[in-house]
Swiss-Prot record:
Name of the protein this chain belongs to: Chalcone synthase 3
One Gene Ontology molecular-function label: naringenin-chalcone synthase activity
Gene designation: CHS3
Pathway(s) the chain acts in: Secondary metabolite biosynthesis; flavonoid biosynthesis
Physiological role: The primary product of this enzyme is 4,2',4',6'-tetrahydroxychalcone (also termed naringenin-chalcone or chalcone) which can under specific conditions spontaneously isomerize into naringenin.
Annotated source species: Sorghum bicolor
SUPFAM superfamilies xrefs: Thiolase-like
Entry-linked PANTHER family: CHALCONE SYNTHASE, HYDROXYMETHYLGLUTARYL-COA SYNTHASE
Catalytic activity as recorded in UniProt: (E)-4-coumaroyl-CoA + 3 malonyl-CoA + 3 H(+) = 2',4,4',6'-tetrahydroxychalcone + 3 CO2 + 4 CoA
Coiled-coil residue windows: none
Amino acid sequence: MAAATVTVEEVRKAQRATGPATVLAIGTATPANCVHQADYPDYYFRITKSEHMTDLKEKFKRMCDKSQIRKRYMHLTEEYLAENPNMCAYMAPSLDARQDIVVVEVPKLGKAAAQKAIKEWGQPKSKITHLVFCTTSGVDMPGADYQLTKMLGLRPSVNRLMMYQQGCFAGGTVLRVAKDLAENNRGARVLVVCSEITAVTFRGPSESHLDSMVGQALFGDGAAAVIVGADPDERVERPLFQLVSASQTILPDSEGAIDGHLREVGLTFHLLKDVPGLISKNIERSLEEAFKPLGITDYNSIFWVAHPGGPAILDQVEAKVGLEKERLRATRHVLSEYGNMSSACVLFILDEMRKRSAEDGQATTGEGFDWGVLFGFGPGLTVETVVLHSVPITTGAAITA
């Protein structure tokens, strides 16, 4: 038998990219239906036929007032909820009605975000080699990844990965996975999509389950998409952020702090009061592990993209690390304008940051800083930590068309 002309090591080297994974484009989308937070308590208690619960309504108003949210977007309209009263009860069988919405609307909203990202990227969609789709809403086979592949007209040979039921940390997870795919497959261009619709979690109030009402006060609908690839061709591609490292960890003593259960009644959501404390108590360890190798100990010298699980989490992280208010400006802006969109949030924040950096005349896509951190927090408690490196802003760059 003739000897092989190449070695495994040579094959492996040829398969891998040279440089780090890079975010090449970002797109976002929301449903048309906009809900203003100031009006939401009256609307919520009216549509769920709970107006007789006056004390509970006052508590909910206070939750909304403290949420630091100005508006959110929701696919569920008053008309649809009126036609599906079981979705307005606290615990009524309603999974079929919820699933019928999300299995259609999740890929559709994802498509809107993906089309914007592909347009900004400016390359033929035939160059997309991988698709990573993430949602906490709606489960079917074939999944939302398949539906989106068909909707966008991607190649049948695109390598798909579907991630269901990850929760709020997953905006970091998809970047970690996309980084590995891009760096280990030379020439790969990974389309990443996070699409979240709260139709699975919407339900009426309960006096015995105030944690469920916290979710009703915070969550909104949205989809975000990014194109990730290594070794960008800068004649036709414009890098936005480099993905330098990525890791995931489960926080100690946090079991049951956030969990969800998909049942006949939809997706129920539960959280303990000490979630902000658990996250802030452990945030410094994650920062040290990520940035000590880089010689960075001043966390005001980096840009921040933190999942806005709620204002208390942001306030306690800010206090624990001694952050200046400006560091979480992009994060708080997205919370204010969209609410908590689960996995999609951090990608919205990346989009806001690169746009605002360009508009403000900053030197880099990361508010003028070179290094940055992206945090995802969610069920587990699970924390995703992604180290980012910004790129210099050239005239007209970093703002989508």
